[in-house]
Design a protein with these regions (language model features):
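Shared catalytic-loop signature of beta/alpha-barrel
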Residues: 4-104
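Extended hydrophobic packing segments that form well-structured cores
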Residues: 106-139
Length: 139
């Protein structure tokens, strides 16, 4: 989903919420654009978050700054401590809620050995292939 897709969906259908993936939609700026547009149409945002602590921290910053947050999706490994060794200070929970990181930037700092432990790999484009009518195909 991109900003334009989100706009078309909100304007042309009766949706209650959108689930943008902040890492594939274009980051925090694009995510905020979608959230603000959705807010103007009484649509909630539920950020899709299947990735690691950087994605989670970015989503939490967006969640803290929009009035139309529905709920924040968390990947399972976020709950079992697997992400903790990726960052210097693990994301924290209190009373069943994830706390918004308050450090500079998005609130986290990668562990010194994160690049060595989790080397980057090239990924293909996440852009969906479209049929002549705009429908997603081969997804």
């Amino acid at each position: 989903m991109c900003i334009r897709d989100s706009s078309n969906l909100v304007q042309n259908t009766d949706v209650a919420f959108l689930r943008p993936d902040m890492c594939t939609i274009g980051g925090i700026t694009a995510g905020m654009k979608v959230a603000h547009f959705a807010e103007a149409h009484n649509v909630n945002i539920i950020p899709h978050n299947p990735l690691g602590p950087v994605s989670t921290a970015a989503c939490l910053q967006i969640c803290a700054s929009i009035p139309n947050l529905g709920i924040q999706e968390l990947p399972g490994f976020c709950l079992n401590g697997a992400e903790d060794k990726m960052v210097k200070e693990p994301l924290r929970f209190e009373n069943g809620c994830m706390l918004i990181p308050e450090a500079p930037g998005i609130g986290i700092e990668l562990a010194d050995d994160a690049e060595e432990l989790y080397p980057a790999n090239e990924r293909g484009s996440n852009a969906a292939r479209r049929a002549f009518d705009g429908a997603v195909k081969d997804w």
